[in-house]
Amino acid sequence: MTTVKPTSPENPRVFFDITIGGVEAGKVVMELYANTVPKTAENFRALCTGEKGIGKSGKPLSYKGSSFHRVITNFMCQGGDFTMGNGTGGESIYGNKFADENFKLKHFGQGTLSMANAGANTNGSQFFICVAPTDWLDGKHVVFGFVTEGMDVVKKMEAAGSQSGKTTKPVVIANCGQL
């Protein structure tokens, strides 16, 4: 497993334990750039721990048990819709969608962690992990973290994807939290 050195010891680190087709695939560890995008990083961190309880949707504000509903090979793995499970839902810890915090960080390559959205200022809980350079997303999606360990697991997730984004097997966040 390749490990990338964290950029700041003050930044929180979170993890996903991933299953693919019901089989353990491994752990993905991510550093969240709270020093640059604190509100976005806090939303993701709290959804990893589940500490905020039940949301407006009546569902737990947690990624645990949710799936990566859209995995496009040579592009990205998208998840975070814990309310509907299909890319139409999700919920932030702030109750509603929240604004794009800033675009200081760039989509530099594989391992970039970024917010999925439906246009400007529509951030909720959906996110994606890039598996390739995606600089055309700069200025449109807020980058808030980076995979520091487990990129091999992300590549296994990508292998369960397709060009359409439909997964061949369920890719699930079996457990998650903060390190």
UniProtKB/Swiss-Prot annotation:
GO terms for molecular function: cyclosporin A binding; peptidyl-prolyl cis-trans isomerase activity. Pfam families: Pro_isomerase. Its EC number is 5.2.1.8. It is found in: Cytoplasm, Cytosol. Disruption phenotype: Grows and develops almost normally, except for the production of tall fruiting bodies. Gene3D superfamilies: Cyclophilin-like. Keywords: Cytoplasm, Isomerase, Rotamase. It comes from the Eukaryota. Binds cyclosporin A (CsA). CsA mediates some of its effects via an inhibitory action on PPIase. Its main location: cytoplasm. GO terms for biological process: protein folding; sorocarp development. The keyword Cytoplasm applies. GO terms for cellular component: cytoplasm; cytosol; intracellular membrane-bounded organelle. It is an enzyme of class 5 (isomerase). PPIase that catalyzes the cis-trans isomerization of proline imidic peptide bonds in oligopeptides and may therefore assist protein folding. This is Peptidyl-prolyl cis-trans isomerase A.
